[in-house]
């Protein structure tokens, strides 16, 4: 009787009661989560913003805003060389962290890529290209793809590069004679897209011939944007979850699917056509695969296609960005420009003398390139890895299994812990022996890894260096460079000076207007 009266007094639960109960439950769960992340998590002792320690939202927001390199640089400047950037994630700028995270490890398995990472190439039919493959699959594919990237292969590809460099110089000469300012960023993009198409499957994009980009080239640049947005979504929603799929549809533009379709379908068609023409004597990547029985046996047709999709995207805009960044630094530093120009013109009596084996021997030109790669890395964003099941030590810090770790490349090269006067463009810091500058003797050069390092380091590093040296040496041999003295030209220089640009895995470079004059001899 008493119980019945009590129930009647209390009444039946209402929507308000249920709402209060749900709210209370959420608050309790959130409080427990915060307490666990702040006081009981294995990473609790590492410094970082309070919000980052309890949620992935700040890290995801940095990606969505296309500002991760800048955001992480600010965090490291405030909190030090090791920062907790997410509840279970650390970012490092220590030199030794490069090898500890990305290097060839002996006592532990190599770190796997984080499932958060997604590049320009998605899996297909359960297969992946080398970029997203697990360690075992990565080793198999890398071994099968290694032959086209050796120095011997580069020498065979030298004539391919020369054709496109000659086209670039011819186009620039016409601009110079007409006294037209040149947007070098665009022309470098035309050049690198044509080169990588010819190198991959003997089919240049035709950008240099038309003096403009095409739909395929534009799609590749946009794919980097979609991949970065997807990484941000994965941070808060997980990988492959219903929430992940829903947020992808909401956040990523519908045309992103078209970007991937254009890139994939074109790459697939070109790859299959090249595979069907094994007798063609052209030293492209697929020709090397066709000529190697081991490579043909190790790679499925789908894997070959996926890797060509990757090489086209990874070997085009990133290289153009480096060329444009180098040109900006040359324009900003006339003393360095004059010294590099004098070195190139003294070394070569004719442009035909500019070759792989000769251009790599120019110490000052190469020093300017290394310094440009330091200050304007083609890959400035963190590349997350996961600590293996046995745990690992990174930069002297014992870390448990499952911890996500990475190096912040842009923060590392701008840290005074690694480089003296880090914001200064100083090619002298890369000179050895007689040309070395004692001010930079203590620089930790290993902090600059523009092509990453270890088993997943960039396969195209040698090709990129060759392409960069060849194009830049030809530019200095043929032309005198000056910044364009116009309102648009000055605004572009301001944006470069402040690194006022978005980052979607690589930099979205601003225009760079240059006045060219033919060299007088």
UniProtKB/Swiss-Prot annotation:
Could you tell me the keywords of this UniProt record? Glycoprotein, Heme, Iron, Membrane, Metal-binding, Monooxygenase, Oxidoreductase, Transmembrane, Transmembrane helix, Virulence
Q: How does it sit in the membrane?
A: Single-pass membrane protein
List of residues binding heme:
458
> Which CDD domains does its entry note?
CYP60B-like
InterPro entries attached to this UniProt entry: Cyt_P450, Cyt_P450_CS, Cyt_P450_E_grp-I, Cyt_P450_sf, Cytochrome_P450_monoxygenase
Lineage: superkingdom: Eukaryota
Q: Which residues are glycosylated?
A: 366
Q: In which pathway does it act?
A: Hormone biosynthesis
A GO cellular component annotation in the UniProt record: membrane
The name this protein goes by in its record: Cytochrome P450 monooxygenase ABA2
Q: What is its main location?
A: membrane
Explain the induction of this protein. Answer: Expression is induced in spores.
Taxonomy of the source species: Eukaryota, Fungi, Dikarya, Ascomycota, Pezizomycotina
Instruction: Give GO MF terms, alphabetically.
Output: heme binding; iron ion binding; monooxygenase activity; oxidoreductase activity, acting on paired donors, with incorporation or reduction of molecular oxygen
EC number per UniProt: 1.-.-.-
Segments spanning the bilayer are 15-35
Q: Name one GO biological process term.
A: abscisic acid biosynthetic process
Subcellular location per UniProt equals:
Membrane
